[in-house]
Amino acid sequence: MVMFKKLLILLIPFFSLGQNYYAYVASESEDTVSLIKFDGKEAVEAERIDVGFMFAEIEGPHGITVDPSGDFWYISLAHGNPFGTLVKYSTETNQAVARTTLGLFPASMEISAITGFLYCVNFNLHGSMKPSNVSVVDPETMTEITKITTGSMPHGSRLSPDGLFQYSVAMMSGELFEIDALDLKVSRVLNLEKKMMSDKKMDGKMMNHDNMKGKMMSKDKKENMMKSMGDMKHSMVKPTWVIPHPKESIAYVAGNGSDEVIEVNLDKWEVSDRFKTGKGPYNLEITPNGKLLIGTIKSEGKTAIWNLENKEELAIIKNTTSVSHGIAISSDSKYAFISVEGIGGEPGIVDVIDLDSYELVSSVKVGKQAGGIAFWKKEI
């Protein structure tokens, strides 16, 4: 028995050396997706896959996700005439197997392990400032089942750990949306702004403004102006991402405009905490063990790591190039894969961060404007 234990201790390093981690990353300005392989020491681009179907223009692969089985990955092509596309690929061959049309500028997405449906936000980057929607797709048939209206510029589609609720934020209207993944309806909406003027106060200010001009405004005209001002609302928070905690009834939101992380108590459906970040937090992810929160600080080209037990910032790591974007975390909570866009004609970069030492341990070049990123598997 003693000899067996000694042998096992000797073999552990060899088992560790045999571990490979795989992630997919989309390069939005090059219409490619790269398969990244990391052996614990060095990250390499194992394969570069051409995506998109229009030869004359860039289609902008933006959001990417791997299904719970690991057999397929999905990419949203944001640009279209005018609508974007969802494309399904086999992880075995990295060949496209099906596609379907979504809404205006489809972006981030995820699949529920319970319903099996894919939920993709339609960001509507170039459209008018009005509520957009979430496309619900059956990945088996690649059929869009419905579109669910949410807020202006929805982003950051993530499912609750039980797969029963989908969460997204509306960047320009400053709201958090909860969708019942079974009923396919919005169940709750939370305003993320610190302060908000009531319609009554806004109405009073408009009336005072009218009186100063010595004019009377008709009720219809005033209502139309109020509606127009509501449509033009610009959030101070500008939320860009939401991630539910894997073990607790809490979600964290990236306040890209307010330079903060917003903690939301999902039971009470209220903001329970806010803590400051660097300039322009963009994406957030939580390690599967629930201990660490990882955030890209887009405007500074950095990645931050927080201890979720006490909200302490454990590290702020400078990324290899500028414009930090997406995050994918290994299933064993050991590594974070960070996509970094770069600027101009620079290649995108995937940085690998060790979540034990909080150090950047490897980097690999990919296509221009590396953005959406998804962890695929750990292989022994």
Describe the residue ranges of each PLM region.
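Predominantly soluble domains enriched in secretory-pathway, periplasmic, or organellar proteins
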Residues: 18-380
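Sec-dependent N-terminal signal peptides
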Residues: 4-15
